[in-house]
């Protein structure tokens, strides 16, 4: 259980991108997560 996940108030999502290449993390954040409000 995550007791202090350091999320924005009212949100509880944590994205697990461990072992991804930095370019792939950037692409995922810019092209998928950010447009969906994460």
From Swiss-Prot:
<keyword id="KW-0868">Chloride</keyword>
<dbReference type="GO" id="GO:0005576">
    <property type="term" value="C:extracellular region"/>
</dbReference>
<keyword id="KW-0964">Secreted</keyword>
<dbReference type="GO" id="GO:0046872">
    <property type="term" value="F:metal ion binding"/>
</dbReference>
<dbReference type="GO" id="GO:0004556">
    <property type="term" value="F:alpha-amylase activity"/>
</dbReference>
<keyword id="KW-0326">Glycosidase</keyword>
<keyword id="KW-1015">Disulfide bond</keyword>
<keyword id="KW-0378">Hydrolase</keyword>
<comment type="subunit">
    <text>Monomer.</text>
</comment>
<comment type="similarity">
    <text>Belongs to the glycosyl hydrolase 13 family.</text>
</comment>
<protein>
    <recommendedName>
        <fullName>Alpha-amylase</fullName>
        <ecNumber>3.2.1.1</ecNumber>
    </recommendedName>
</protein>
<keyword id="KW-0106">Calcium</keyword>
<keyword id="KW-0119">Carbohydrate metabolism</keyword>
<keyword id="KW-0479">Metal-binding</keyword>
